[in-house]
Amino acid sequence: LMAYGQTYKHIGVEDGLSNRRIYNIQKDHQGYMWFLTNEGMDRYNGKDIKHYKLIEENKQLSSEIHLGWLYADKEGGIWVIGKKGRIFQYEEKYDRFTMVYKSPKVTDAISYGYLDRNNNLWLCGKDSILLYNTKTTQVMRLPNLLEDNITVVEQADDTHFFIATEMGVRYTQFENEALKVIPLDMLDHVYTQINSLYFHPQLHRLFVGTFSDGTFAYDMSAHQIIKSDTKLGDVSITHINSSLKNSQA
């Protein structure tokens, strides 16, 4: 029997956090914690908090730029996606965030931003999905086949993705610069707003968190929906993840 103790520390504006509203938290390769707030980016090194403004063409942007999503890539790089189609990269050499991409369409409204395992940042709009490759800086625009606001994306393997909207979740394949929807029994007939997704590769199951209908799982092998015995009422499920590494159960 092994037991592990855990230490928790509360961090607030009184400790230097720029805003109480936190959109996302990531940990980089140095162990620093990054916080995406309503005012920009904060970095916590275990002792002090440093605030970062975002830079566009050598000009500091105001906090009213509608930031949305924060990701750390496999090499520890930090990326920020804005709701108006901007992408910012943390430059470790200069200790700053610089804009590396801006959507040419001023009207582009991003409902969800995502970083996949293929180094693509997804900027999901209602009519189209823009892919920005962090290695090559190449940009690709795909039609949004779901024709609805995308709420979450979850990668299953190198080419397959689950894409959720306010009306359900679909299984897709991205290959040869094209995205196509793959029909799945039962899952295609779920009509509810999806807030969160987690795919368990060993179990081959997709775990789904909804806005007001609790959680359920979809078994890819049996093509069955598995509902939890625990009733969560009208609790909105915003995030699902595995608490066990290399879990087989």
State where each predicted segment sits.
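Carboxylate-rich, polar loop motifs that coordinate divalent cations or form catalytic acidic clusters
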Residues: L1-A249
